[in-house]
């Protein structure tokens, strides 16, 4: 496997003239400027030092992205020939967007498809059914369809609007052996299958589950195995900013006893990952911070070698993880020429001080607070609760609100509910997992251990 990618020197050279990283630059560079930067980087013999570069956060990036997205001047090439990925809702409720060059995006999909095949996530003859989302600006369906096709599979691109009963019929009728979707969609379908008569469930020939976007809990994994039998569970890791970049495979890293972490394999020829102490989340300018040794957990910082026109350099993801060597067991699968380039990223999850995840989307607490505290809402106190359904291990989201009595200038209750539902990206397939509860007094909220403080976020899933 010889993945196409840019050199670190090329990526840093373009970053120097890009407004993501240079506040004196108004617009991203034109194609000729990018080409000149690449040629200069290739000719320069000086050592490339990533450690002298400042880190950027999501807030840093999207402050610039917001300006570029709304600037329709002819000189703003950010809006030209771009593939748009969306990420968690902004404070106004509409999704944030990251633009990638269209040709870069296609090449990235091809390279990652080869990586999936090299890691045996996909085998010759696999038939894959995907239930990923499309529409409402989501591109998950076309992304995963192309990735699996590039990896050598035959794909049934079913999407998220088919009912579980319809998906089941397609799985059975076409002898599909691989099911892929967001974690929430997978669990929704597995729950449907678990309710069917045994003889109907036996029509399925599934050998693999490949989930994306959100980790499966231990209860969810057990539910899958109890329903489908001894099936392999794989995963794909990616983001709007970096695209897909790692795969989770028990064949490579072994079955995990601890489900509070998930092991992923990534290729250092396409993605550089540094791990920093958690203290960088609280430092205004963590330039002096140094990466922790391999094996120690900390904040994941990414530099993509597949993003050039809009580079991703030392991006603080807010995720917690650690980097490890591949275990020896992986030699049976990984080619010798690739071995030295692959690493294990052990993902511990999101830094829960700053965000939470529901139905494959991250929500920043800062943005939730801005929504709840906006003028005219009349919200005196609020709380977000993650839980699971009693009938299945699907994750639910409840928003509890204590509101001032109706007065002049307040939004109507209906308008407020509509605004909150828009913020949390409600779709037909997750509406039944969402609830807004208006409480009469402070007693309607979950309290801290001392019983005096209302907790803004309660997670009953862990």
PLM regions: where:
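Nucleotide 5′-phosphate-binding alpha/beta core
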Residues: 1-118, 123, 396-400, 406-462
């Amino acid at each position: 496997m010889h993945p196409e990618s840019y050199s670190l020197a090329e990526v840093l050279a373009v970053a120097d003239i890009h407004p993501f990283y240079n506040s004196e630059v108004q617009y991203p560079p034109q194609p000729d400027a990018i080409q000149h930067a690449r040629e200069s980087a290739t000719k320069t013999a000086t050592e490339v030092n990533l450690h002298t570069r400042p880190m950027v956060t999501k807030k840093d990036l999207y402050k610039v992205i917001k300006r570029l997205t709304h600037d329709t001047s002819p000189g703003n090439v950010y809006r030209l020939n771009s593939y748009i990925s969306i990420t968690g809702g902004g404070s106004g409720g509409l999704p944030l967007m990251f633009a990638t060059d269209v040709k870069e995006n296609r090449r990235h999909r091809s390279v990652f498809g080869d990586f999936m095949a090299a890691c045996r996530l996909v085998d010759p003859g696999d038939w894959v059914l995907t239930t990923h989302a499309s529409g409402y600006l989501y591109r998950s369906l076309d992304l995963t369809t192309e990735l699996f096709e590039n990896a050598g599979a035959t794909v049934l691109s079913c999407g998220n609007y088919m009912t579980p009963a319809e998906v089941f019929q397609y799985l059975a009728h076409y002898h599909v052996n691989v099911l892929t979707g967001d974690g929430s969609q997978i669990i929704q379908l597995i729950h449907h299958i678990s309710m069917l008569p045994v003889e109907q469930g036996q029509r399925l020939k599934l050998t693999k589950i490949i989930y994306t976007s959100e980790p499966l809990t231990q209860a969810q994994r057990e539910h899958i195995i109890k329903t489908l039998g001894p099936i392999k569970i794989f995963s794909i890791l990616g983001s709007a900013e970096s695209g897909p970049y790692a795969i989770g495979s028990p064949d490579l890293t072994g079955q995990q006893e601890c489900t509070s972490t998930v092991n992923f394999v990534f290729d250092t020829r396409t993605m550089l990952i540094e791990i920093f102490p958690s203290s960088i989340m609280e430092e205004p300018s963590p330039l002096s911070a140094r990466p922790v040794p391999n094996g120690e957990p900390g904040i994941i910082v990414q530099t993509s070698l597949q993003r050039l026109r809009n580079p991703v350099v030392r991006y603080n993801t807010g995720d917690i993880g650690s980097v490890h060597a591949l275990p020896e067991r992986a030699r049976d699968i990984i080619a010798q020429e690739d071995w030295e380039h692959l690493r294990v990223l052990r993902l511990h999850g999101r830094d829960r001080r700053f965000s939470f995840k529901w139905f494959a989307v991250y929500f920043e607490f800062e943005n939730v607070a801005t929504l709840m505290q906006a003028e005219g809402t009349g919200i005196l106190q609020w709380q977000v609760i993650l839980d699971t359904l009693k009938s299945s291990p699907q994750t639910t989201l409840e928003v509890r609100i204590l509101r001032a009595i109706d007065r002049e200038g307040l939004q109507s209750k209906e308008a407020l509910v509509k605004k909150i539902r828009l913020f949390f990206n409600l779709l037909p397939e997750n509406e039944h997992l969402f609830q807004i509860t208006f409480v009469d007094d402070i007693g309607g909220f979950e309290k801290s251990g001392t019983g005096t403080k209302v907790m803004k976020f309660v997670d009953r899933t862990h």
